[in-house]
């Protein structure tokens, strides 16, 4: 039997296409009427009494006070709690079969974000085949990730896992010499009970390279939660203050940098306490997006002390009770929990900076946490953030004309559904349903509040939110509602297109730059692409006829 071996993922530079899967034949059965579908009085069949009680709590503050949770108390939290109470009639949990990628796919973007890292996925051939298809690279690229392939001798415990992993890590150190090695656990390591967390501290001492263990396996609800697992593990690694790689060249950690702010904006003891606060943003986005969001906050007098993850592992920020943290993506609830429980950080509850409306409120909530009022425009009397939001929407009129009055249906794939639905509602679309693999109503309280507010402002019904949707029943609802656009995973795209349903791959929103003010056009370009294709096709048919 062969021992555990290091298998580099090298493949041809080709593109993968969605498989034309069968959906069990043609559509059958009748769907519920639309008036019943949007009924506010429909019972919540998927929520238990304990889930209903917990949804009324203002995030983690009341429920887990003993765990050291703390949260910035703004009006949005009260509004968010009230909104969640009202959302019970719109929320449903089907616990059905749905399709998504494996969370180990987070390696695709994290190894590029953390430039001095090396990701080692510990799994079977199935994991390797998936990564080879999902992470296609050219043969001379030498990617900073590899596959530690488990074979029969490893699973039957005939080999010493520690010795084999040590041999591989020494080989990685010799070949690449990274600043950190990230072990990605898989379903197999869970089943055979590999003690990765127990081996990592001992091994990193021997080889002199920190090792972060992240169990990003198929037990999660969505593939984007793999990033959540890795960032949560890195947040725990930042607690090792005695480790040299956490200290920069100046000998100071990022959290020791004071927030630069004029004394005129704060007064008294509270002002001195605010001056000690530092801001750390967590979420993996491209470096151009981090620069844009950092500059947006700097315009309002707020300096970002650090990002999780950082481009270099040695710049990983440390966290303490004086650290304010705010999320970038809606699938990072585990990271937020770790930062609050283990690091005693304070979480700023805010919508996510997706779309100009979400970005504006996101910046406003951060400003409120630091006691800063957003700058005003002396001509209009509005805040500069509000004027900029309106200016961006005015510049998108060519896209908005195509979207107004159109309907969209989210089948659920990457946990970005609520933020995208809120933005598309603001653009004039009608959202029939928001399918989402997993919804943390506490972490997304502000996003849910903004969604409800946007629906009221646009005078459209609140969409039904279906957690863990059953794809079979979703397809029946799609047939009944006939949406103009269905945002779905790759597994269903081709079969739905074959049945005359316009689709868009949800995974494209994961890899596109959709955060901040400047990337709004990128979102609308993705959304309108299939609609414009249909429009051109219809025009061609009419011209021929």
UniProtKB/Swiss-Prot annotation:
Pfam families to which the protein is assigned, alphabetical: Oxidored_nitro (PF00148)
Subcellular location: Plastid, Chloroplast
GO biological process, one term: light-independent chlorophyll biosynthetic process
EC code: 1.3.7.7
The protein's required cofactors: [4Fe-4S] cluster
Binding-site residues for [4Fe-4S] cluster, renumbered to this chain: 102, 127, 187
Reaction(s) this enzyme catalyzes, per UniProt: chlorophyllide a + oxidized 2[4Fe-4S]-[ferredoxin] + 2 ADP + 2 phosphate = protochlorophyllide a + reduced 2[4Fe-4S]-[ferredoxin] + 2 ATP + 2 H2O
Cofactor remark from the record: Binds 1 [4Fe-4S] cluster per heterodimer. The cluster is bound at the heterodimer interface by residues from both subunits.
GO molecular function, one term: oxidoreductase activity, acting on the CH-CH group of donors, iron-sulfur protein as acceptor
Any coiled-coil regions, as ranges: none
Pathway(s) it belongs to: Porphyrin-containing compound metabolism; chlorophyll biosynthesis (light-independent)
Domain of life from the UniProt record: Eukaryota
The entry's keywords: 4Fe-4S, ATP-binding, Chlorophyll biosynthesis, Chloroplast, Iron, Iron-sulfur, Metal-binding, Nucleotide-binding, Oxidoreductase, Photosynthesis, Plastid
Claim: Iron-sulfur is one of the keywords in the record: yes
SUPFAM superfamilies: Helical backbone' metal receptor (SSF53807)
PANTHER family membership: LIGHT-INDEPENDENT PROTOCHLOROPHYLLIDE REDUCTASE SUBUNIT N
Family: Belongs to the BchN/ChlN family.
Role played: Component of the dark-operative protochlorophyllide reductase (DPOR) that uses Mg-ATP and reduced ferredoxin to reduce ring D of protochlorophyllide (Pchlide) to form chlorophyllide a (Chlide). This reaction is light-independent. The NB-protein (ChlN-ChlB) is the catalytic component of the complex.
Subunit structure: Protochlorophyllide reductase is composed of three subunits; ChlL, ChlN and ChlB. Forms a heterotetramer of two ChlB and two ChlN subunits.
Entry protein name: Light-independent protochlorophyllide reductase subunit N
Gene that encodes the chain: chlN
